[in-house]
């Protein structure tokens, strides 16, 4: 059996993408699973440029029984944001342009997710507002 997970794109415009992630765990959890594939985001409608990366503009989340790590994908993944277990919050980073991707060698622009401390019945709901980059 596997965790019951969903990834739902709420908005995917020229500048902003909003994605909802959910998980109801069967106890297996997730390990470095790609949740945001920037190459799959909509291209810029004005010039056709493909999205090459994102900044984390805002995160709204609720976790029950497990913690979650969002990771910037690279040869050696780096932490984008830690989501505490049994916690609900709304963090807005748009006032300073968003959380930058700090990955080094092999940087893809994608965001991965890993759960820790998961047991059967634990869950998360995460809504990410992403600021798209076309460089």
PLM feature spans:
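C-terminal interaction-tip segments
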Residues: 1-15, 115-135
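N-terminal low-complexity, intrinsically disordered "leader/linker" segments enriched in small/polar
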Residues: 1-60
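Extracellular or exported targeting regions of proteins
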Residues: 51, 60-64, 80-82, 102
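Extended, low-complexity, turn-rich repeat/linker tracts enriched in Gly/Pro/Ser/Thr and Asp/Glu
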Residues: 60-69, 118-120
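Short, surface-exposed beta-strand/strand-loop-strand elements in extracellular ectodomains
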Residues: 64-85
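An anionic, turn-rich surface loop/hairpin at beta-sheet edges
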Residues: 78-100
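Noncatalytic modules at the cell exterior or secretory-pathway interfaces
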Residues: 97-124
């Amino acid at each position: 059996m596997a965790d019951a997970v969903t990834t739902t794109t709420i908005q995917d415009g020229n500048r902003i993408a909003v994605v909802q992630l959910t998980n109801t765990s069967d106890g297996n959890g997730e390990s470095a699973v790609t949740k945001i594939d920037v190459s799959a985001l909509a291209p810029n409608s004005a010039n056709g440029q493909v999205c090459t990366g994102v900044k984390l503009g805002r995160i709204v989340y609720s976790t029950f029984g497990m913690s979650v790590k969002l990771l910037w994908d690279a040869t050696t993944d780096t932490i984008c944001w830690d989501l505490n277990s049994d916690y609900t919050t709304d963090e807005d980073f748009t006032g300073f342009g968003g959380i930058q991707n700090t990955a080094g060698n092999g940087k893809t622009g994608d965001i991965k997710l890993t759960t820790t401390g998961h047991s059967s019945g634990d869950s998360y709901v995460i809504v990410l507002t992403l600021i798209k980059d076309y460089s």
